[in-house]
Amino acid sequence: MRIEEGLKLGFKDVLIRPKRSTLKSRSEVELERQFTFKHSGWNWSGVPIIAANMDTVGTFRMAEVLASFDVLTAVHKHYTVEQWGEFVKRVPESVLRHVMVSTGTSSADFDKMKQILALSPALKFICIDVANGYSEHFVSFLQKAREACPDKVICAGNVVTGEMVEELILSGADIVKVGIGPGSVCTTRVKTGVGYPQLSAVIECADAAHGLGGQIVSDGGCSVPGDVAKAFGGGADFVMLGGMLAGHDECEGRVVEENGEKFMLFYGMSSESAMKRHVGGVAEYRAAEGKTVKLPLRGSVDNTVRDIMGGLRSACTYVGASHLKELTKRTTFIRVAEQENRVFGSN
């Protein structure tokens, strides 16, 4: 046993210090980024925000809408190959280029992933997703996927430390997914005592990834657009959002009615709700590590995406970054004891 004494920070522990700027308007800020990925060599340009691969968020409908904003969607792994086939036939390649095919790490998952990718060459992204990216089995699966799919962009995770980011990149990942426990409906930190404050994880993992020519995605911990800006400011190349995109028309959560008001259920993918839906219940050897919440229906996701992107542009103008890529170079974090004036409630 040992204790690391250094302070680790989450998004709520800091604010971004404003700086002199030559920008006259938020409209001058360019959010699109261009990447050439380490292993696949593929060039991609777009707004580096990703809808999370949760079965109530990473849906086909979400992918269609977000593609119109040049935003990615990690489509959840529970659609059948037949459902994927119908989707591929229905949408243009411009949508498919903004889609990640999510997979688990079993042999059946691998076979299913290959069948889905064979449906269209426009499907370029793979998201290999497990709660604990530190297992040898996960690394072996990543190596197997890289060997089978040399031209695909592989996003793999989740981890929170630099040495594991390096191992995953050297094993074939183009992008490493960073975050253990920060999600809005994740209870891993409560159930296990394991985790890492998200901003510090992003800063440390970005440094490790960029040293090897890889990228990271900050997964979890964002509850407002300012948190998204902080993630990019901390060095994240992509930011993945679940709760901020939940409860919209494009989601597939079950709708319930209470006292005449309708709500949509949103739950973590290790919650009892998720395990009942997909594997028949919680296995007797494990505990659920997610919760279920009821969200008021929020309408179309369009307005939420515009709000997030507007907040990002504004953050860039406050520090003089004309392009999103410049935000991390222009960011100085200050530690704070409060985030906002709550006299009329939280914004």
Swiss-Prot record:
The keyword NADP applies. PROSITE patterns: IMP_DH_GMP_RED. It is an enzyme of class 1 (oxidoreductase). K(+) binds at G181, G183. It comes from the Bacteria. The keyword Transcription regulation does not apply. The active site is at C186. It holds the Pfam family IMPDH. NADP(+) binds at residues 108-131, 216-239. It catalyses: IMP + NH4(+) + NADP(+) = GMP + NADPH + 2 H(+). Keywords: Metal-binding, NADP, Oxidoreductase, Potassium. SUPFAM superfamilies: Inosine monophosphate dehydrogenase (IMPDH). GO terms for biological process: purine nucleotide metabolic process. GO terms for molecular function: GMP reductase activity; metal ion binding. Its EC number is 1.7.1.7. InterPro entries: Aldolase_TIM, GMP_reductase, GMPR, IMP_DH/GMP_Rdtase_CS, IMP_DH_GMPRt. GO terms for cellular component: cytosol; GMP reductase complex. Catalyzes the irreversible NADPH-dependent deamination of GMP to IMP. It functions in the conversion of nucleobase, nucleoside and nucleotide derivatives of G to A nucleotides, and in maintaining the intracellular balance of A and G nucleotides. NCBIfam families: GMP_reduct_1, PRK05096.1. HAMAP family: GMP_reduct_type1. Belongs to the IMPDH/GMPR family. GuaC type 1 subfamily. Homotetramer. This is GMP reductase.
